[in-house]
Amino acid sequence: MMFQDSVAFEDVAVTFTQEEWALLDPSQKNLCRDVMQETFRNLASIGKKWKPQNIYVEYENLRRNLRIVGERLFESKEGHQHGEILTQVPDDMLKKTTTGVKSCESSVYGEVGSAHSSLNRHIRDDTGHKAYEYQEYGQKPYKCKYCKKPFNCLSSVQTHERAHSGRKLYVCEECGKTFISHSNLQRHRIMHRGDGPYKCKFCGKALMFLSLYLIHKRTHTGEKPYQCKQCGKAFSHSSSLRIHERTHTGEKPYKCNECGKAFHSSTCLHAHKRTHTGEKPYECKQCGKAFSSSHSFQIHERTHTGEKPYECKECGKAFKCPSSVRRHERTHSRKKPYECKHCGKVLSYLTSFQNHLGMHTGEISHKCKICGKAFYSPSSLQTHEKTHTGEKPYKCNQCGKAFNSSSSFRYHERTHTGEKPYECKQCGKAFRSASLLQTHGRTHTGEKPYACKECGKPFSNFSFFQIHERMHREEKPYECKGYGKTFSLPSLFHRHERTHTGGKTYECKQCGRSFNCSSSFRYHGRTHTGEKPYECKQCGKAFRSASQLQIHGRTHTGEKPYECKQCGKAFGSASHLQMHGRTHTGEKPYECKQCGKSFGCASRLQMHGRTHTGEKPYKCKQCGKAFGCPSNLRRHGRTHTGEKPYKCNQCGKVFRCSSQLQVHGRAHCIDTP
């Protein structure tokens, strides 16, 4: 018979994790083994002569024996540092309750609770001994029915299986969070207390357990002792390595009961379940924002404190979260650990890799509950959802501008600092973001990895590919609340919004002119510098922007992909189609504030505005004459070059500008009877 009030070994043992055990030298490990052998002999004797009245006497003997381990290590000169850590374990950590059945079956100890101890496992690993000369110890007869992981204790396998089923029996009284085991609940309660005997010398954080302290310390030291045999990637603790290994094997043992989706780890499953329940148990005390995971909550807190504990070893730059420092470090190493099995493409980031995979499989599993729009990755969905709520949690301290994603915020910060950390190895040009560098790189290679499934057209830029796809779907998800106008891109939507607010955040230092979007500002800057970085390979003509080069390219190919549905007329660019559409509708949305005159396009309004201001920013390099619009400068330039590109089909006469050809054409019409 099994004693109902028996004391299992794990109730009284001071156990070592793999990390803690690694700190001990061989003599200290032998000392631990000798003391723990004595402990087992005590347990065995209790098993033979078990009497309820002797429980507490024997329990005190066990406690005394276990404490000797710490004391002897502390006295050892060699183990002084490690002994100091061990003797920090407070007395109350050993005073665990003696009630409740916590025994496991063992062919050696019979009715006595077996020693399910991390220490014993590490003694076997490091010394090669069978645990305390008992051959049967170390067997793991209990296997998880979901993932087949072996355990040497029935209660352990039952606790583990709850991670798969999602059953959580232990509830935190303070915040209502639930856990699969009592030990996990106890560890969680410490978060509410905010105390612990192990204080980090780097950041002052106090931790309750030595194992947690050692793992936490690695976030500062950068130590990563667990390495993946397949790809060489290293991790700070073994559980992270196990989860990572599943990305190679494809194993996803944790399944959602509600939608059937499977995950690599139980934490991912629990975080996913909250997308069904809407639960966000972690609330920020400063701003009230709630989070579904403690990790996201901790990173958010740093936006208030300004703490950046993760530092790049190469350049010293600090970051709020480990994923950001890893992403940054790849800019130094150019490492791309994620390889696509479909096309062989290698990517630097897991999110980019997941997005890329979705393009091959067509799987778009993350759907917006408000508008039904689907996304390849959860991060893209989260960013999109903020367009509905209007939430912009990332605020620039310099100009006050707010953003709905941290990446947009980081990119914006560089407009103030001028930082361009991503440099092209071929031409030396620098960029503010890795994605811009990647897109630029394709101008050298000619690579166009994004192909439209409907018409087969390839693109070098993913955002251009998305814009093009919306042209087929006629999708315009971004709507102006004031006028009801819809847009296919958030950038176009935000640019339009500024026409209402009058917000112009980008000012030219040379002429004082301000712009409401960074691309217009950059394009304008080239009118001063004369820079034209985009050159046509067919005729050598250069342009200030990639879009201009693309539109020009169609004059060679004759391609006109934008067709008017009303009259069938086709155009080489979307803007020209849009402008043409207004000839049917009569719409003139751009109004001059000085005289009230309206125009069908922004550029016409801009040129008209110069008739009021007298501004003539386009200057002829040969004679110094200035003009209000670029077309007039081009026309004037032909008086110097003698170029006459407009030819009459009837008589062959040539002209400098299209208007002269049109006037001449009318003369033929009059002559015709």
UniProtKB/Swiss-Prot annotation:
Protein name, entry field: Zinc finger protein 433
Keywords: DNA-binding, Metal-binding, Nucleus, Repeat, Transcription, Transcription regulation, Zinc, Zinc-finger
Keyword Metal-binding listed: yes
Domain KRAB, chain residue ranges per copy: 7-85
InterPro entries reported in the protein's UniProt record: KRAB (IPR001909), KRAB_dom_sf (IPR036051), Znf_C2H2_sf (IPR036236), Znf_C2H2_type (IPR013087)
GO biological process: regulation of transcription by RNA polymerase II
Gene designation: ZNF433
Known function: May be involved in transcriptional regulation.
Positions of C2H2-type zinc fingers: 142-164, 170-192, 198-220, 226-248, 254-276, 282-304, 310-332, 338-360, 366-388, 394-416, 422-444, 450-472, 478-500, 506-528, 534-556, 562-584, 590-612, 618-640, 646-668
PANTHER family the record matches: ZINC FINGER PROTEIN, ZINC FINGER PROTEIN 124-RELATED
GO MF terms held by the record: DNA-binding transcription factor activity, RNA polymerase II-specific; RNA polymerase II transcription regulatory region sequence-specific DNA binding; zinc ion binding
GO CC aspect terms: nucleus
Entries under SUPFAM superfamilies matching the protein: beta-beta-alpha zinc fingers (SSF57667), KRAB domain (Kruppel-associated box) (SSF109640)
Residues making up the signal peptide according to the UniProt record: none
Domain of life assignment: Eukaryota
Family of this protein: Belongs to the krueppel C2H2-type zinc-finger protein family.
Subcellular location: Nucleus
Protein source organism: Homo sapiens (Human)
